[in-house]
Amino acid sequence: MKVDERWVPSDPGTSLYIRPFLYGTDAKLGLHGVHTAQFIIILSPVGSYFDNGMEPVKIIVETEDVRAVRGGTGEAKCGGNYGASNRAGERAFANGYSQVLWLDGVEHKYVEEGGGMNVVFKINGRIITPMLTGSILPGVTSRSCLQLFEDW
């Protein structure tokens, strides 16, 4: 970080986006496990994730498409997970929403996560966040909120 510290933004509403990723580099294609891989971390200065900055976002509950199911890759930061969410995201944006709120992939009634973040609710004085059951990325948002609430 010291070498590239000039790239770390310090203006209000900015941050350093960190994206690690891993991809297979085997010499042949096929239906087999990966034997060699490349691990890369991209660091990029960014502004607000949403066009409206730090203002609340308008979200829509997705009742048709499924982002992830238990036993799949939903709990991993996996590039393929984004493909499953594109259609619903495009519909949401076309209708004036910033994000999709995803429901479970089986019954379509239990809240799982937002398209770009975990979700944490305060309902009747109780803090509620979806359980990590294999289809939700265990992200820094919910972990940070839960730690803050525990410390209070």
Q: How would you name each of these model-derived features?
A:
Residues 1-3, 9-11:
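N-terminal leader/propeptide and maturation segments of large enzyme subunits in energy/redox metabolism
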Residues 15-17:
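C-terminal catalytic domains of large/alpha subunits in multi-subunit enzymes
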Residues 21, 28-152:
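Helix-start/capping segments and mature chain N-termini
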